[in-house]
Amino acid sequence: MRKIKTIDDITKDGKVEFGEGYEFVSTAEEADAILMRSTDLHGYELPEGIRAIARCGAGVNNIPVEEYAKKGVVVFNSPGANSNAVKELVLGMLVLSSRGVVQSMNWVRDNADDPEIQVDAEKAKKAFVGRELKGKRIGVIGLGNVGSKVANACVDLGMDVYGYDPFISVEHAWVLSREVQRVGTLEDLCRGCDYLTVHVPSKADTIGMISTEQINLLAPDAVLINYARETIIDEDAVDAALREGKLSWFSCDFATPKTVKMPNTLITTHSGAGTGEAEANCADMAISELKDYLENGNIAHSVNYPACSMGKARAASRIACLHANVPNMIGQITAILAKDNANVQRMTNESAGENAYTMFDTDEHLDSSTIEALKQIPSMYRVRVIK
C-alpha cells in the first residue's frame, strides 16, 4: 500500500482520489509522497521516506527544488492544468480596464439611494466611456500554456496580436494562431502596444523584465496586465508610469504593499487559477504524475529531474537511480550489475542540468547486496526498487 500525505486544501470539494493501492496518512513521516498546493516548504524538514512531491499548480517558488533533488526527491508540477482559468481572468481584465466597468458599478452603488437614479445614470455614463478591444494592439510575453491561449483568444476578439517567446515549444507553436505575429525582441513587442500582458515564469532573466524602458515604448494610455509572477514587474516603474499617465491601468494578481497603493489598479487575490475546474484539473494531473512515478518510475513534468519513461513496469525487476549528472555513473551501475550476473533487459538515462536519472529492467530480482552496492556509488542520491 502506497501512502500519500496531502498538504493544503487540494480541491474545493475536498475530493482527492488515488484509487486502489493507495491510502492517505496524517503525517509526512508515514508517507511515500506529498500532494500539495501553496504551503511554503523552505525550511521544512523533509522526512527521508518521501520519494516525490507533486504541486497542484505550475509555480514551485514555495518548494526548494534543488535541495530536494540532491535528496533524490522528484518534484512535479501541473503546468497547463489551470491555463484556461487564468486566460479567462486575463480576458476579463482586458474588458474591465477598457470600459470603465468598475467605476460605473461603484457610481451605481454610491448612488443607490438616489430616487432619480435612472435619469442620473444616463447623465453619469458619459464619465465612463471606454474603448473597444477590436483593432487594438496587444503584446503577449510568453507563449506557453497560458500565453498561447490568451494570444489566440485576443485574435478571436479582433485584436492585433504580437507575441514574444524565444523559447516557445513545438507543442505551443503548433496551437498558436497564424494571426499571432511573433517578434524577435522584447523591445519590438512593446513598441506601440495598447495592451501588454505577461505570461512567463519567475527566473533570473525575467525578474524585473518590465520596467521603465519597456513601459516608455508602449502606446499612450496603455494597459499592463500581470497574471504570471509578481517579480516580473518593476513595481516602482509601474507606480511612476501610472501617476504620470503613461499607463492608464495596471491589473495584476498580486496584492503587495506597493501595488495596493498604486492609482488605477485592478488587483485580485492571486485568483488566476481560482476555479473549481482548475483545481480539479491540477489535482488530476499531479495525481497521475505521482502514480506513474511511484508505480513505474516514469517522470513527466518534473522541475528538478529530466523527463524519462519506460512505460509499465513489466519485467521481473525495475530499478531507478537518482544521481548527479557526472561522468561514469552508468559505467559504475552496469559494473555492479555485471558483477552480480544481473541481465539488463532495458535501460534508459536522461539528464537535466546537474541531475540525472537512470532506470533499468532486469530479468531477475536483485538481491539486497546489489541494491546496497548501487547506493554506495559516489554522487548517487537515491536508489528505488520499483518492482
Which positions does each model-derived feature cover?
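Rossmann-like adenosine-cofactor binding region
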Residues: 39-44, 167-259, 274
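A conserved regulatory-domain signal marking ACT and ACT-like small-molecule sensing domains
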Residues: 304-387
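Oxidoreductase and adenylate-handling cofactor-binding alpha/beta cores
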Residues: 87-106, 155-159, 284-298, 334-342
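Hydrophobic/small residue at the entry helix of a nucleotide-binding pocket
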Residues: 146
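Phosphate-binding beta-alpha-beta segment of Rossmann-like dinucleotide-binding domains, i.e.
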Residues: 79-137, 301-303
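An N-terminal-biased, well-structured beta-alpha scaffold segment characteristic
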Residues: 1-79, 211-213, 217, 234, ...
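Rossmann-like dinucleotide-binding domain for NAD(H)/NADP(H)
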Residues: 216, 220-313, 322-324, 357, ...
